[in-house]
């Protein structure tokens, strides 16, 4: 009897335990659901946010991801970027989601202070709140227990103010910290974050020296803070020291009078000696200059002196192709309608546009206000004959409408110059990243640029040529934002490709290993450019540890995000403003990932890439046409 009673009690306890566990699990998920409903009830939002008790929380609610592999099945991600949320976040709503790992509310119209219960969620790893209007100070008291699991914290483009709280130093796992475009002030010595790899504090009101552990960050991480100083910005200037009796006397006051007189004599002797030395060096310089001038007048290859009288003959009178090398030093191409010579270029006002893989580019404004771009090449290994042959090829290729027109070139022993048409709208890199506050590159423009660039590369490949240096700064734009590829097929004039900070992020893995470019590596580089247009990120290098440069591997980053099914986090925040382009964006993302396949043989040919982009663009245009037609019909029905 006793054993039967004991078995009954044990069985009852077991079933009660199971029931309690089930109730607890249900309560956890139910509490998550109630917290989300409270948030939706308090924050105005568009109708498309379909949160209600009649739908399954984990499978049907927009923006919600649950960890269904866990028996507790908790909400682990809330992703609502650019959905039109408006208002402040009440406490005890999202802050109740204690299993949350990812929270993305970027690109909405949220304002007010940041609830401390969100920042202190114990499991939170990724927090994206950029491009809202949050305000107030982030004091240490308001962050008593900020989540130590945070890996990415993005509070950029808000109106937060005050000092950067010292509580952030507790973020031992953080690798990305974005605080740019706020109103933070004060010093930044509290940011003792050894684990951080990428930091951006630009466009705040911060002051003081940059801490040692942040000095390897790029300059753009700190610009817009006029009171910040130290590497990578300008050196800090020592402050004025007020006189004090406690300060040591100047050394000269402690010298014996005789020694002081001796020191004066030494100083006078040094000054006289230096003056004589400078005078002697000046005489030597003048002698050398006179000899060099005589040599140039007698037939040397000086850049300034040998003009060949280009002004005496208009460029269009020279016939087809390149002018006779013996007649002129500045060789014009057939379609060049300008009339200037090398002396005009040398006298023109010049502005440095940038340094590329092959040399430095200058904008030169001639006396008749004509603007051209002069690229001064460096480390050319080709002979004069090889150089001229390559120029003929480049001149013919550049007749395609999607290449920057090459107007003329100059070759001498010491100088190699290329003269291009000046493109008024700059480069793709410039409009994407040059001014973060006014980027404004819409989807249609990006597709237009991708289409034209793919046609240019496809045409180049059809002629059996390789570009070898495809990157966003080499995609220049006309007044109508039509893309024109520059630096076409110049790679053959130089040594094997070099990996500079502005190129290595675009280079295919095999180029980095073998230093050999191919049409397949061109496809890879173009794939990186597409990813750049889709994500808004730059595949440039960042300073790393021990003076090594750690590359931001854009393809790898995109793959990792897509693998975690966070596809929405991949796309540029600017693109989320546009409606009904999600399908085209995903198709372009898939195409770009095919282009950046690690195996060269797995990449599509450029002809196929150009055709697929055309298909996506046609789909985009047809959907836009259908949308306009629907809107027009709706307006007509209302008016009737």
From Swiss-Prot:
Catalytic residue positions: 469
Positions of post-translational Phosphoserine modification: 349, 427, 518
Region (Disordered): 299-321, 619-640
Enzyme Commission number(s): 2.7.11.-
One Pfam family cited in the UniProt record for this chain: Pkinase
Record's function text: Probable leucine-rich repeat receptor-like protein kinase.
Full protein name: Probable leucine-rich repeat receptor-like protein kinase At5g05160
Transmembrane feature ranges: 267-287
């Amino acid at each position: 009897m006793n054993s039967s009673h004991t078995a009954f009690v044990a069985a009852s306890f077991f079933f009660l335990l199971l029931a309690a566990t089930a109730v607890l699990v249900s309560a956890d998920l139910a509490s998550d659901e109630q917290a989300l409903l409270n948030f939706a009830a308090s924050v105005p939002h568009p109708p498309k946010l379909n949160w209600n008790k009649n739908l399954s929380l984990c499978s049907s609610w927009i923006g919600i991801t649950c960890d269904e592999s866990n028996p507790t099945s908790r909400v682990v991600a809330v992703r609502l970027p650019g959905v039109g949320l408006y208002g402040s976040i009440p406490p005890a709503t999202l802050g109740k989601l204690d299993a949350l790992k990812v929270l993305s509310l970027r690109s909405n119209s949220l304002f007010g202070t940041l609830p401390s219960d969100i920042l202190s969620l114990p499991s939170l790893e990724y927090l994206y709140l950029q491009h809202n209007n949050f305000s107030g100070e982030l004091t240490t008291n308001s962050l008593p227990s900020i989540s130590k699991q945070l890996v990415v914290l993005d509070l950029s483009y808000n109106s937060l103010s005050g000092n950067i709280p010292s509580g952030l130093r507790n973020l031992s796992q953080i690798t990305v910290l974005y605080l740019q475009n706020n109103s933070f002030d004060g010093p930044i010595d509290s940011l003792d974050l050894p684990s951080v790899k990428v930091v951006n504090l630009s466009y705040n009101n911060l002051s003081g020296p940059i801490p040692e552990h942040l000095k390897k960050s790029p300059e753009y991480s700190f610009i817009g803070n006029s009171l910040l100083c130290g590497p990578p910005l300008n050196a800090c200037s020592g402050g004025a020291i007020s006189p004090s009796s406690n300060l040591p006397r100047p050394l000269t006051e402690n010298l014996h009078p005789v020694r002081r007189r001796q020191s004066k004599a030494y100083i006078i002797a040094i000054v006289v000696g230096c003056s004589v030395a400078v005078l002697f060096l000046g005489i030597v310089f003048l002698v050398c200059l006179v000899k060099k001038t005589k040599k140039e007048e007698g037939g040397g290859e000086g850049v300034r002196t040998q003009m060949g009288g280009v002004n005496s003959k208009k460029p269009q009178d020279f016939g087809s192709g390149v002018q006779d090398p013996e007649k002129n030093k500045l060789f014009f191409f057939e379609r060049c309608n300008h009339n200037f010579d090398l002396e005009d270029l040398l006298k023109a006002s010049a502005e440095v546009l940038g340094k590329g893989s092959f040399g430095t580019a200058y904008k030169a404004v001639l006396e008749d206000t004509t603007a051209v771009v002069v690229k001064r090449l460096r480390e050319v290994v080709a002979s004069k004959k090889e150089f001229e042959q390559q120029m003929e090829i480049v001149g013919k290729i550049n007749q395609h409408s999607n290449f920057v027109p090459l107007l003329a070139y100059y070759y001498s022993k010491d100088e190699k110059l290329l003269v291009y048409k000046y493109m008024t709208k700059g480069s793709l890199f410039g409009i994407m990243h040059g001014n973060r506050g006014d980027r404004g590159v819409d989807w249609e423009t990006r597709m237009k640029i991708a289409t034209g660039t793919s046609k240019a590369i496809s045409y180049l490949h059809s002629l059996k040529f390789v570009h070898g240096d495809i990157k966003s700064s080499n995609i220049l734009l006309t007044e109508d934002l039509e893309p024109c590829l520059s630096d076409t097929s110049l790679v053959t004039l130089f040594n094997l490709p070099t990996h500079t900070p502005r190129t290595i992020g675009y280079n295919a893995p095999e180029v980095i290993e073998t230093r050999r470019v191919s049409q397949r590596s061109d496809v890879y580089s173009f794939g990186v450019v597409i990813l750049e247009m889709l994500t808004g990120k730059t595949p440039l290098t960042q300073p790393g540890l021990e003076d090594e440069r750690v590359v931001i591997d854009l393809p790898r980053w995109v793959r990792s995000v897509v693998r975690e099914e966070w596809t929405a986090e991949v796309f540029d925040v600017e693109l989320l403003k546009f409606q009904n382009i999600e399908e085209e964006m995903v198709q372009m993302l898939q195409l770009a990932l095919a282009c950046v396949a690690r195996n060269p043989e797995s990449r599509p040919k450029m002809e196929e890439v150009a055709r697929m982009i055309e298909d996506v663009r046609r789909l985009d245009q047809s959907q836009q046409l259908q949308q306009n037609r629907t809107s027009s019909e709706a307006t007509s029905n209302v008016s009737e």
